[in-house]
Amino acid sequence: MGIKLINIGFGNIVSANRLIAIVSPESAPIKRIIQEARDRGMLIDATYGRRTRAVIITDSDHVILSAVQPETVAHRLSTKGEEDEISEVEAQ
């Protein structure tokens, strides 16, 4: 199994194998998670100064802010998985 990478906007790429959740930043619990990650030094801001639209939580407890909609990131994740499955079938 190879490394799957997902584009989260502005040329920033995250390993799909490390993702736990892709959520909207609007709710109070998610805002609290963002602030706690900032305090711990585990926050990665990939928004380039734009509005945060998706919060990505990884298995290493890093919290990544993205300016791309959560649905877009999820779609990129699902289409990437389909492409990998197709290439694996063709290789057999």
UniProtKB/Swiss-Prot annotation:
A Pfam family: RemA-like
Residue ranges that the Swiss-Prot or TrEMBL entry lists as coiled coil: none
Annotated InterPro entries: RemA-like
Family (UniProt): Belongs to the RemA family.
Full protein name: Putative regulatory protein CKL_1364
Organism of this sequence: Clostridium kluyveri (strain ATCC 8527 / DSM 555 / NBRC 12016 / NCIMB 10680 / K1)
